[in-house]
Amino acid sequence: MPLQAPSIGEKFPEIEVMTTHGKIKLPDHFRGKWFVLFSHPADFTPVCTTEFVAFAKRYEDFKKLNTELIGLSVDSTFSHIKWAEWIKEKLGVEIPFPIIADPTGEVAKKLGLLHAQSSTATVRAVFVVDDKGVVRAILYYPQEVGRNIDEILRLIESLQISDKYGRAIPANWPNNELIGDNLIVPPAATVQEAEERLKKFKCFDWWFCYEDKATAEEKELARKFLKRVANC
């Protein structure tokens, strides 16, 4: 993977890109908002088409989380536009977000998104970038498997809740098998803190404590995403 490829916790690189909505400077274009940059192997392919329809249908859910979307592949702007037109005409779904045109592959190279065996195919990847321009999550999928958009939504909400409350998010939250919709308290830093937390929080042991912190609205939104994940 190229040295420039960002890692989790690093700033998203400053790049200017051409999109179906014109020139955009990343990450500044989305300053104050979260954004999801997702790459796809190619326009006019079945799996990618299903993904774009799914992203478009969930677009308002992303906006409720102060999150924007932007696609990317090593296709031209013309190809992106014609593909989006085909999706609207044939499938009745309008693509409301920009798609980066990268026919030379330069943007994909900077982000480490080209297949190792090919210089003309983008991997199926997702970058989740927060409102400060920091990469918070990176997901990779095989070519033959499309992404689950509702899980990406649940991931973003979980990261935002973790930031808000300073707590960690358990597996399958808010329907975790051990602690339900509670949040995990960070590990104790001292012996005294470890002893005190046993009195202050619900705990399985000093290193595994949890509390009910998120609001009812936050839990309900996450349950909606999780339910749709389960039903897919």
Swiss-Prot record:
It comes from the Archaea. Disulfide bonds join C203-C209. InterPro entries: AhpC/TSA, Peroxiredoxin, Peroxiredoxin_AhpC-typ, Peroxiredoxin_C, Peroxiredoxin_TDXH, PRX_1cys, Thioredoxin-like_sf, Thioredoxin_domain. It catalyses: a hydroperoxide + [thioredoxin]-dithiol = an alcohol + [thioredoxin]-disulfide + H2O. The active site is at C48 (cysteine sulfenic acid (-soh) intermediate). The keyword Lipoprotein does not apply. Substrate binds at R124. GO terms for cellular component: cytosol. Keywords: Antioxidant, Cytoplasm, Disulfide bond, Oxidoreductase, Peroxidase, Redox-active center. GO terms for molecular function: thioredoxin peroxidase activity. Homodecamer. Pentamer of dimers that assemble into a ring structure. The active site is a conserved redox-active cysteine residue, the peroxidatic cysteine (C(P)), which makes the nucleophilic attack on the peroxide substrate. The peroxide oxidizes the C(P)-SH to cysteine sulfenic acid (C(P)-SOH), which then reacts with another cysteine residue, the resolving cysteine (C(R)), to form a disulfide bridge. The disulfide is subsequently reduced by an appropriate electron donor to complete the catalytic cycle. Thiol-specific peroxidase that catalyzes the reduction of hydrogen peroxide and organic hydroperoxides to water and alcohols, respectively. Plays a role in cell protection against oxidative stress by detoxifying peroxides. This is Peroxiredoxin. It comes from Hyperthermus butylicus (strain DSM 5456 / JCM 9403 / PLM1-5).
